[in-house]
Curated annotation (Swiss-Prot):
Biased composition (Basic and acidic residues): 514-527
Enzymatic reactions: ATP + H2O = ADP + phosphate + H(+)
CDD domains reported in the protein's UniProt record: KU70
A cellular component annotation (GO) from this entry: chromosome, telomeric region
Record protein name field: ATP-dependent DNA helicase II subunit 1
Main location: nucleus
Quaternary structure, from the entry: Heterodimer of Ku70 and Ku80.
Domain Ku, residue spans: 239-444
GO biological process: DNA recombination; double-strand break repair via nonhomologous end joining; telomere maintenance
Native source organism of the sequence: Yarrowia lipolytica (strain CLIB 122 / E 150)
C-alpha cells in the first residue's frame, strides 16, 4: 500500500492549541409544531440554540453558526400582525459570525412569553423544500468550509405519509450528503406518554449510519452542547503494525483543557483614536550590556555548558532534533496486566487513534482487525511515536477502547530520564474501627451513576464567558458565578450527618490513649535496636507533655531524622523546646 499525500507538506502537524483551525459551519434547524409550542419544547430548543450560538462565538470564533425555523408561517417583528405566508423556512440567524443585534433578536424570540402567537403552523410541511433551502444556504454562506453540519430538531414523527414526498425528501438529504453536509437528527418524544416513532418517516429518509433514536426534551441542551464544538483531528500519520504493513490513522484529543486566554479568543485593541483598532504586537531583541537592537537573523540559540555558551544554527538544531519521519511504530504486544501500574506514570494527555482511508486505502479494515485482536486477547501494544516533524520521540501504550467507538487510546509513558525519585513517606495505619466508620460514610455518599464530567462545567471558564457575553450584548453583568461543584451540604447532612458524628467519636476514642500506655510504648522505643521515635509517637508524647522522659541521644536521633536541632546550646531542655515548637506547642 502506498501513502497518498494530498498536502504540500503533510509532515506538519497542528499543535494542541491550534487543533481547531479547520472551520466548522453549524446550522441548528428547529421544526415549529403545535405540540412543541404547547409543551414548551420550542422554548427549550430556542434557548439551547441561543446558548450554542453565544458559546461558539467565544469558544471557536472562527466558526459559523446559524439558526433556522421551519414548518410554520412566522410573524415579523416589524410587520405587526402580518404573517410571512410565502415560505415556511425562516433563517433567524444566517450562517456567519452573528452581530450583537442578531443575537439579541434570537434571545428576544427565545424569551417571548407569547411565542405561540407568532407562528401559524402548517399541517403538512414540505420537508423536501426545507432540505433544499438548507442545501442552497450552505452553498451560498459556507462554500469552502471543511466541516458543515446540521442539527435537525423535531417532535413530529409523521410529517407526511405521501410516498412521493418521502422519496423526494430522501433525495434532498442525499444531496446534502454529497455536499459533505452531515445531518444529525434530534428526535424528541412528543410527550411523556408518547414515544417518537422513527419508523414512520425518518428511518426511511436517513441512511442507516444516521442515528434516529428519540430523546427526551430535557436532554436538548446536553445533546447540542456535545456537538457544539467540532472535535478536529490533531494529526494524521502512518501507523506501522509490522514490516511492510502500514495504515493511516488520525489522532484526537478527547480531553483538552479549555482556556479563556487562548490566542484565538483575545486581541489587543487600541482605544486612543476615534474608534477601537486591533493592535499588532511586535517584539524586538536587544543586548543586555548595551541595549542595542539585534536583527533576528543575527541571533543564535545557545545552550549552557558549564560557564560557556554553545551556539547552534537553525540547521544544526533541526539536525540534532531529527529522529525520523512522523510515525507510530508498534514495537510489541503485552498482556494488559503487565502494564497495570504504568497508567499512573503518564507524562502528558492521552490521545485517541482512529483509522482513515484518506491517504492509505484499506487502513480502516486493517486497523479494525488490530483493534479486535487486542480487545479479544486482552492485549496492549507498545509503540514508538513521533506525531510531527521535529517532535521528540516518545513511548506509548495503545489500549483498545471499551466504548462504542472502535479506536485505540494512546497513553504516553516516561523514559528513564523523566522518572523522579519517590518521596520518603511513613506508612500510618488507622484503627480498624475508624476504617469501618469511614467506609460507612463513603458508601452512603457514592454517586449512583459514578462521576460524570459533562455535568460539571468549569466554573471559572463559564464565569468568564458569561461576563464577556453580558458586556458584548450590553446586558447587566452577573454578580455571582454559578458553580455546580459546590457541595450540597443539606443533602450531605441528611445522608451521612449521623455517620459523621459517629466517625468523630471513633476518631477521638482511638487517638486518645492513656499516658501510661504511651509511656510503655516509648520504653520500647528506648531500646538500642528501636532507633529514634516516629513522628506519630513523638506527637503523642508532646500532647501528653512527656517529651522530657526521652534521653538526649533519642532526641538527637529524632532531630537528625527530621533535620532539626537547637540553635546554640544543645542541652536536654533545648531539645524538648525544639520538639514542642516543631509540633506547634
Amino acid at each position: 500500500m502506498e501513502w497518498i499525500s494530498h498536502l504540500e507538506n503533510d509532515d506538519d502537524v497542528l499543535e494542541i492549541e491550534d487543533y481547531k483551525v479547520r472551520k466548522d459551519a453549524l446550522l441548528i434547524a428547529i421544526q415549529v409544531t403545535q405540540n412543541a409550542i404547547n409543551n414548551g419544547t420550542l422554548h427549550k430548543a430556542l434557548e439551547a440554540a441561543f446558548d450554542a450560538v453565544t458559546d461558539r462565538i467565544v469558544i471557536s470564533p472562527q466558526d459559523y453558526t446559524g439558526v433556522m425555523l421551519f414548518g410554520a408561517s412566522m410573524q415579523s417583528e416589524d410587520d405587526g400582525d402580518e404573517f410571512d405566508d410565502e415560505s415556511d423556512t425562516h433563517f433567524i440567524l444566517k450562517l456567519g459570525l452573528p452581530t450583537a443585534a442578531q443575537i439579541k433578536r434570537l434571545k428576544r424570540l427565545a424569551e417571548d412569553p407569547d411565542l405561540g402567537e407568532r407562528f401559524k403552523v402548517q399541517e403538512e410541511p414540505h420537508l423536501m423544500d426545507v432540505f433544499f433551502d438548507m442545501n442552497r444556504h450552505f452553498i451560498n454562506m459556507a462554500p469552502n468550509f471543511a466541516s458543515r453540519r446540521i442539527i435537525y430538531i423535531t417532535d413530529d414523527d409523521t410529517p407526511t405519509t405521501n410516498e412521493d414526498d418521502i422519496n423526494k425528501t430522501r433525495v434532498r438529504i442525499e444531496d446534502l450528503s454529497h455536499l459533505k453536509v452531515k445531518v444529525e437528527p434530534l428526535l424528541i418524544n412528543p410527550s411523556e406518554d408518547k414515544t417518537f416513532d422513527s419508523s414512520k418517516f425518518y428511518a426511511l429518509v436517513f441512511n442507516e449510519d444516521t442515528s434516529v433514536e428519540p430523546v427526551e426534551a430535557i436532554d436538548l441542551k446536553q445533546f447540542i452542547n456535545k456537538r457544539n464544538v467540532l472535535n478536529r483531528s490533531l494529526f494524521n500519520v502512518k501507523m506501522e503494525i509490522g514490516e511492510g504493513l502500514v495504515v493511516g490513522v488520525r489522532g484526537y484529543l478527547l480531553y483538552a483543557e479549555q482556556k479563556a486566554t487562548s490566542t484565538t479568543r483575545k486581541a489587543w485593541v487600541y482605544t486612543g483614536g476615534e474608534k477601537p483598532e486591533i493592535a499588532k504586537l511586535e517584539s524586538q531583541a536587544v543586548t543586555i550590556e548595551s541595549g542595542r537592537s539585534v536583527d533576528k537573523a543575527d541571533l543564535r540559540k545557545t545552550f549552557k555548558f558549564g560557564n560557556d555558551y554553545v551556539p547552534f544554527t537553525e540547521e544544526q538544531l533541526t539536525q540534532i532534533r531529527y529522529f525520523g519521519e512522523p510515525i507510530i511504530r508498534i514495537l510489541g504486544f503485552h498482556n494488559s496486566s503487565d502494564f497495570s501500574e504504568l497508567f499512573i506514570h503518564s507524562v502528558r494527555s492521552s490521545m485517541f487513534l482512529y483509522p482513515t482511508d484518506e491517504k492509505l486505502v484499506g487502513s480502516i479494515r486493517a486497523f479494525s482487525a488490530l483493534y479486535q485482536s487486542l480487545k479479544n486477547k486482552d492485549k496492549m501494544a507498545l509503540a514508538w511515536v513521533i506525531v510531527r516533524k521535529g517532535a521528540k520521540p516518545i513511548l506509548a501504550l495503545l489500549i483498545p477502547s471499551t466504548k462504542e467507538i472502535e479506536g485505540l487510546h494512546m497513553v504516553f509513558l516516561p523514559f528513564t530520564d523523566d522518572i523522579r525519585q519517590e518521596p520518603k513517606t511513613e506508612l500510618v495505619s488507622a484503627a480498624p474501627e475508624l476504617v469501618d466508620a469511614t467506609k460507612n460514610i463513603f458508601t452512603r455518599l457514592r454517586m449512583p451513576g459514578g462521576f460524570e464530567s459533562q455535568r460539571y462545567p468549569n466554573p471559572r471558564l463559564q464565569w468568564h464567558y458569561r461576563v464577556v457575553r453580558a458586556m458584548a450584548l450590553q446586558e447587566e453583568v452577573p454578580k455571582v458565578p454559578e458553580d455546580k461543584t459546590t457541595p450540597k451540604y443539606r443533602s450531605i447532612d441528611t445522608r451521612v450527618g449521623d455517620a459523621i458524628e459517629e466517625w468523630n467519636k471513633v476518631l477521638q476514642s482511638s487517638s486518645k490513649r492513656p499516658a501510661e500506655d504511651i509511656c510503655k510504648a516509648e520504653k520500647k522505643v528506648k531500646s538500642s535496636d528501636a532507633g529514634p521515635p516516629s513522628n506519630e509517637q513523638m506527637q503523642n508524647m508532646v500532647e501528653n507533655d512527656i517529651v522530657g522522659k526521652l534521653t538526649v541521644a533519642e532526641l538527637r536521633a529524632w532531630g537528625a531524622a527530621n533535620n532539626v536541632e537547637p540553635n546554640g546550646s544543645k542541652l536536654k531542655k533545648d531539645w524538648v523546646e525544639v520538639v514542642k515548637k516543631y509540633y506547634g506547642k
